[in-house]
Swiss-Prot record:
In the adult, predominantly expressed in heart and kidney. In 8 week old mice, expressed in growing primary oocytes and in the stromal cells of the theca. It comes from Mus musculus. Disulfide bonds: none annotated. The modification Phosphoserine is found at S27, S32, S45, S614, S681. The modification N6-acetyllysine is found at K400. Keywords: Acetylation, Cytoplasm, Developmental protein, Phosphoprotein, Repeat, RNA-binding. Residues 692-702 have a biased composition (Basic and acidic residues). The gene is Bicc1. Interacts (via KH domains) with ANKS6 (via SAM domain) in an RNA-dependent manner. Interacts with ANKS3. This is Protein bicaudal C homolog 1. One of its GO terms (biological process) is negative regulation of canonical Wnt signaling pathway. The lineage of its organism: Eukaryota, Metazoa, Chordata, Craniata, Vertebrata. Residues 134-201, 286-350 form the KH domain.
Length: 977
């Protein structure tokens, strides 16, 4: 084998001066002249043969050592006896150096008649042979990490070889060839030792995490890695931290370097460093890492049509980028980006897809039926090749697979050789490197369970056969290793064109979900029931596309949820749907209130299923809509406003008994606040008109939906005429908008656990989801959209048409105005329309603008009068965040807060100051300078009444009040959902 016949540079470097003659002493010593003369007549005989083979070095050394100590027969006696019994000549290395550093097995040469040679070889091998139990494993380790694995002076790899009893060979060619580097590392030894050495090598690999530190440079120099705080993090978590200034721009790249066998500490240290350097921005800064994978393996690892990588990205949440094959410089570097947990997990899964080759010898007289080989390949997800060795009476067996399937490779060897055991136990191969945290067994493999074994990698045949036949029920993860068909490699000819081969058995163990969920949920705070609902879990047994942001599968039902330390165990049972699964709305039942209450220490409020959590909510009629968009708040800190919201809702119930179903957190399909559920969805898309609704419910269910929709429509028409309900509904909406603004402006507390909920779902308060984007999404869903800016005549006709049909208002219109869609006219009296140009009409327009704004601060100016000095009158005693919120510059608030710049200091800034702060966008600087100019000019008028005449720049083009046009998929591209 190559690894045994070619000396590695490590082994060569370790050889001592006394072993320079080792090669000669390993070679057989020729017989005496008398022996050669006696054998001369037989040299030309047709029956004469000569065979050269290797014997186990350790056993031969032990034989010579025992003879030297007088405890056994010497090598001379052993070979002489065989020569006499078989009438052969045997040449063996009698001068073998005992205890030499060389691990190479010496050769024995036997000469004589063919039958005699065969008999002599059997006698020798019965004592000195271990080749039948010796294997060679070839694995991929990036050449850039070889020195890290070897260690200083070879100390790391020496210890691995001593502990495992294996010889590990690194490629010699890397020292001289600068263009092409080999990543292949060979391990030779006993199966258990080889597998243990493979896992140990993976643990020795470096783990490097990087992130970009924003806003450094002039005002904030690059942090010093020698500061006490950073040194404390470095020493506590055994990592090294370095900073590199980015050229031509602000910011710095932070690199955290640790070891794979210390993964948890590296992740914790990186999180601590992020928190220390970035503060509240830590959660928004992505972390990246990279893997060096040989370019020839990229297509294999990506899978057919990239299915393998897509599944890993969908499962972990990390972004994976393979380089352009035409790029000569970085053609082997794969980039990963995401959260700390997702990046590390995706890295593990990618390394589990690296190719692995197991080689061993088989006796020549062993014959294996090709059908048996094919069955083994299908069952064990491996490729098997058996070839005769030239000039040797044995066969060479090659087994190929991927690293996450290493155990099955040894299982294939056991079956081929007819052994009782594979020689490798599960405990031997388990390590943090070989098995990601949370997987109790290598067979619990998300890639294989999703049909992404070697078939999914695009190189296997069309047939599949499951090794596991237990019919356990479907779970969130089909976690057992579904088997696939044989891998076609270059050694077996051209690969046969195959179709996608989905797994036959989607089986899962009882612990399939309970051992996995924390892989996708980084902490207990994000593993609440609401977050599971919002995550929209697709079926992994099929290649179902991930749902658009805010859409959740219809048939996902939550049964129970238990908290055990930091791990969340849950069982999600439901119908596993094919790729065309439907997604339905997320009902705003009291689940949200239960989750909210549990976060504030209320022991009576336990998170439970829908049936126990919402005794007041109506039955399954709450899921009739086809789609609903969910707007998530930008800063979901509810500790400061949850009590206020619940108190407000309680007061609403006391003041109006008929509003018992109007509560935001208990609103269902029949609630009076139907606009809460449907604010961002098509108001006309009822159960009787939606094509998806017809597909959802067969027969009687469809009739029940129609009846519920009709009842709801009549109820809303009746309630729309009641001024009490109208005022309460408007009051609720405005109060909730104010509370939402306070929640977004509230500074997060480091020690506070912040849990996303659906409290503000569907109300359009989110700063990260502009109103214009929502309108574009509604337009994409075939909802008619009327522009907000109309001419005087269009506005007049619109007002008249709205006031002429009360029924139209009650049933909900396609207007962009929230009041009109919910049957609320200006001041509750929509039947009286004001004449064109009258103050009443202007007031109505301002109210429409107020309730159509994307957040509370955007709409304040509309309530101060058209002639008022909006900017100054709205910000009496206000602070800088509110001003930026009004100007649409909210994303720069953190920059100014970090530099401790308040409103008074802001008024003194110049264009150059803004540039030094990192405000590089011209439009943003222009808005800020205009605001500074306007506020400075009118500082004396800040406390004048609102009707003081002054010109507000916000009413002009600089304010950005004109409707902005967004691409329909801007929200998905921005990644801020």
């Amino acid at each position: 084998m190559a690894s045994q016949s070619e000396p590695g540079y490590l082994a060569a470097a370790q050889s001592d001066p006394g072993s320079n003659s080792e090669r000669s002493t390993d070679s057989p010593v020729a017989g005496s002249e008398d022996d050669l003369v006696a054998a001369a007549p037989l040299l030309h005989s047709p029956e004469w043969s000569e065979e050269r083979f290797r014997v186990d070095r350790k056993k031969l050394e032990a034989m010579l050592q025992a003879a030297a100590e007088g405890k056994g027969r010497s090598g001379e006696d052993f070979f002489q006896k065989i020569m006499e019994e078989t009438n052969t000549q045997i040449a063996w290395p009698s001068k073998l150096k005992i205890g030499a550093k060389s691990k190479k097995d010496p050769h024995i040469k036997v000469s004589g008649k063919k039958e005699d040679v065969k008999e002599a070889k059997e006698m020798i091998m019965s004592v000195l042979d271990t080749k039948s139990n010796r294997v060679t494993l070839k694995m991929d380790v990036s050449h850039t990490e070889h020195s890290h694995v070897i260690g200083k002076g070879g100390n790391n790899i020496k210890k691995v070889m001593e502990d495992t009893g294996c010889h590990i060979h690194f490629p010699d060619s890397n020292r001289n060839n600068q263009a092409e580097k080999s990543n292949q590392v060979s391990i030779a030894g006993q199966p258990a030792g080889v597998e243990s050495a493979r896992a140990r090598i993976r643990e020795l690999l470096p783990l490097v995490l990087m992130f970009e530190l924003p806003i450094a440079g002039i005002l904030q120099p690059v942090p010093d890695p020698n500061t006490p705080s950073i040194q404390h993090i470095s020493q506590t978590y055994s990592v090294s931290v370095s900073f590199k200034q980015r050229s031509r721009m602000y910011g710095a790249t932070v690199t955290v370097r640790g070891s794979q066998n210390n993964t948890n500490a590296v992740k914790e240290g990186t999180a601590m460093l992020l928190e220390h350097l970035a503060g509240s921005l830590a959660s928004a800064i992505p972390v990246s890492t990279q893997l060096d994978i040989a370019a020839q393996h990229h297509l294999f690892m990506m899978g057919r049509n990239g299915s393998n990588v897509k599944h890993i990205m969908q499962r972990t949440g990390a972004q994976i980028h393979f380089p352009d094959p035409s790029n000569p410089q970085k053609k082997s570097t794969v980039y990963l980006q995401g959260t700390i947990e997702s990046v590390c997990l995706a890295r593990q899964y990618l390394m589990g897809c690296l190719p692995l080759v197991l080689m061993f010898d088989m006796k020549e007289d062993i014959e294996v039926d090709p059908q048996v080989i094919a069955q083994l390949m299908e069952q064990l997800d491996v490729f098997i090749s058996i070839k005769p060795k030239p000039k040797q009476p044995s066969k060479s067996v090659i087994v190929k697979s991927v690293e996450r399937n290493a155990l099955n490779m040894y299982e294939a060897r056991k079956c081929l050789l007819g052994l009782e055991s594979s020689g490798v136990s599960i405990a031997t191969s388990l390590s943090p490197a070989s098995c990601p945290a949370g997987l109790a067994c290598p067979s619990l493999d998300i890639l294989a369970s999703a049909g992404l074994g070697l078939t999914g990698l695009g190189l296997l045949g069309p047939t599949t056969l499951s090794l596991n036949t237990s019919a356990t029920p479907n779970s969130l993860l089909n976690a057992l290793n579904t088997s696939v068909s044989p891998l076609q490699s270059s050694s077996s000819g051209t690969p046969s064109p195959t179709l996608w081969a989905p797994p036959i058995a989607n089986t899962a163990s009882a612990t399939g979900f309970s051992t996995i969920p924390h892989l996708m949920l980084p902490s207990t705070a994000q593993a609440t029931l609401t977050n599971i609902l919002l995550s929209g879990v697709p079926t992994y047994g099929h290649t179902a596309p991930s749902p658009p942001p805010g859409l959740t599968p219809v048939d996902v039902h939550i049964n129970s949820m238990q908290t055990e330390g930091k791990n969340i165990s849950a069982s999600i049972n439901g119908h596993v749907q094919p790729a065309n699964m439907k997604y339905g709305p997320l009902s705003t039942s009291s689940l949200g209130e239960k989750v909210l209450s549990s976060n504030h220490g209320d022991p009576s409020m336990q998170t439970a299923g829908p049936e126990q959590a919402s005794p007041k909510s109506n039955s399954v009629e709450g899921c009739n809509d086809a789609f609903v968009e969910v707007g998530m708040p930008r800063s979901p800190s509810h500790s400061g406003n949850a009590g206020d919201l619940k108190q407000m809702l309680g007061a609403s119930k006391v003041s109006c008994a008929k509003r018992q179903t109007v509560e935001l957190l208990q609103g269902t399909k029949n609630s009076h606040l139907h606009g809460t559920d449907r604010l961002l969805s098509d108001p006309e898309l009822s159960a009787t008109e939606s094509p998806l609704a017809d597909k959802k419910a067969p027969g009687s269910e469809r009739a029940a939906e129609r009846a519920a929709a009709a009842q709801q429509k009549s109820e809303r028409a009746r309630l729309a005429s009641q001024p009490t309900y109208v005022h309460m509904q408007a009051f609720d909406y405005e109060q909730k908008k104010l509370l939402a603004t306070k929640a977004m402006l509230k500074k997060p507390v480091v020690t506070e656990v912040r849990t996303p909920t659906n409290t503000w779902s569907g109300l359009g308060f989110s700063k990260s989801m502009p109103a214009e984007t929502i309108k574009e999404l509604r337009r994409a869903n075939h909802v008619s959209y009327k522009p907000t800016m109309t001419t005087a005549y269009e506005g007049s006709s619109l007002s008249l048409s709205r006031s002429s049909s009360r029924e139209h208002l009650a049933s909900g219109s396609e207007s962009d105005n929230w009041r009109d869609r919910n049957g609320i006219g200006p001041m509750g009296h929509s039947e009286f329309s004001a004449p064109i140009g009258s103050p009443k009409r202007k007031q109505n327009k301002s109210r429409e603008h107020y309730l159509s704004s994307s957040n509370y601060m955007d709409c304040i100016s509309s309530l101060t009068g058209s002639n008022g000095c909006n900017l100054n009158s709205c910000f009496k005693g206000s602070d800088l965040p509110e001003l930026f919120s009004k100007l649409g510059l909210g994303k720069y608030t953190d920059v100014f807060q970090q530099q401790e710049i308040d409103l008074q200091t802001f008024l003194t800034l110049t264009d150059q100051d803004l540039k030094e702060l990192g405000i590089t966008t011209f439009g943003a600087r222009r808005k800020m300078l205009l605001a500074i100019s306007e506020l400075s000019k009118n500082r004396r008028k800040l406390f004048e009444p609102p009707n003081a005449s002054c010109t507000s720049f916000l009413e002009g083009g600089a304010s950005g009040r004109l409707p902005r046009q967004y691409h329909s998929d801007i929200a998905s591209v921005s990644g801020r959902w």
